[in-house]
């Protein structure tokens, strides 16, 4: 999957990111079982989606590989609000993006600076920096 890198499941920790069923997620719970008589150690991950509020679970051996999304955090200025879309200008590259209006971020207005991230080709506003 583009925009990801493979890592071993055993190296992941709570709070890190993983792609489960092509959905980028943040790990919220993780349990490791010890190796037994008939096999290696297993990991059970519980994760919440970054873009949709969905709960995902994954079980696998600690030596198996999983994709981790490459997350790019950036700052931008709100140019306009068009219904449920926010038009943002990136403050480094001056590119213009249209990002869905977040539900969990306080009131957003034109001219505000916001922090957003890009993962697996999708964007999300995370917080308002200045008003």
UniProtKB/Swiss-Prot annotation:
List of residues that carry Hypusine: 37
A Gene Ontology term for the protein's cellular component: cytoplasm
Localization terms from the record: Cytoplasm
Entry keywords, A to Z: Cytoplasm, Hypusine, Initiation factor, Protein biosynthesis
MF annotations from Gene Ontology: ribosome binding; RNA binding; translation elongation factor activity; translation initiation factor activity
Pfam family name, one: IF5A-like_N
UniProt superkingdom: Archaea
HAMAP family xref list: eIF_5A (MF_00085)
NCBIfam families: eIF_5A, PRK03999.1
Its job: Functions by promoting the formation of the first peptide bond.
Protein name: Translation initiation factor 5A
Organism: Methanococcus aeolicus (strain ATCC BAA-1280 / DSM 17508 / OCM 812 / Nankai-3)
Biological classification of the source: Archaea, Methanobacteriati, Methanobacteriota, Methanomada group, Methanococci
